[in-house]
């Protein structure tokens, strides 16, 4: 029994939600999102909340149950408040800058890395060593942040590279003479 799936998802103030078949749509101050729930899961509106139940007690239905509830919850939070992911750059000469709609990264390569920011995502560079990725879709914000981090992930000896804000890098000891 999914402890997460059992709880109904309350529709926050300022968000209008509708359920049409297996599609949940939400509209809020930040924008509009929809999520198609898996066929193994039943979804319905009850008393200003969205309720998610498994169609039967099969393993697949139970495995999709909690995930579907969380995805619907993320849609509501996204259209109301949005999501944000911060990245930090550390290393000599490593920096970031916005160039129009593209993010330009100097990460120690012989060339500049230019990242084309997808639609629906906003990237800001408050400092040359800090990147802030924001948007209404939690999955897309996380994916963009992961793609930026992938260009030069933090290395374990000096900690140089792109890392998430607050991420702890497990450091290794260098060679001994």
Curated annotation (Swiss-Prot):
Coiled coil: none annotated. Keywords: Ribonucleoprotein, Ribosomal protein, RNA-binding, rRNA-binding. GO terms for molecular function: rRNA binding; structural constituent of ribosome. One of its GO terms (cellular component) is cytosolic large ribosomal subunit. One of its GO terms (biological process) is cytoplasmic translation. InterPro entries: Ribosomal_uL6-like, Ribosomal_uL6-like_a/b-dom_sf, Ribosomal_uL6_a/b-dom, Ribosomal_uL6_bac-type, Ribosomal_uL6_CS. Belongs to the universal ribosomal protein uL6 family. This protein binds to the 23S rRNA, and is important in its secondary structure. It is located near the subunit interface in the base of the L7/L12 stalk, and near the tRNA binding site of the peptidyltransferase center. Part of the 50S ribosomal subunit. This is Large ribosomal subunit protein uL6. The gene is rplF.
């Amino acid at each position: 029994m999914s402890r997460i799936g059992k709880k109904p998802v309350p529709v926050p103030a300022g968000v209008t939600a509708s359920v049409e078949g297996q599609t949940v749509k939400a509209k809020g101050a930040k924008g509009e999102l929809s999520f198609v729930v898996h066929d193994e899961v039943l979804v319905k509106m009850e008393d200003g909340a969205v309720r998610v139940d498994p169609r039967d007690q099969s393993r697949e239905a139970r495995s999709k149950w909690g995930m579907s509830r969380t995805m619907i919850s993320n849609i509501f939070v996204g259209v109301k408040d949005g999501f944000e992911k911060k990245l930090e750059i550390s290393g000599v000469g490593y920096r970031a800058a916005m160039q129009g709609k593209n993010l330009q990264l100097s990460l120690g390569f012989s060339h500049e890395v230019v990242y084309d920011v997808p639609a629906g995502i906003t990237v800001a560079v408050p400092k040359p060593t800090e990147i802030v990725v924001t948007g209404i879709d939690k999955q897309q914000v996380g994916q963009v942040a992961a793609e930026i981090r992938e260009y030069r992930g933090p290395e374990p000896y000096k900690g140089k590279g792109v890392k998430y804000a607050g991420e702890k890098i497990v450091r290794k000891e260098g060679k001994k003479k």
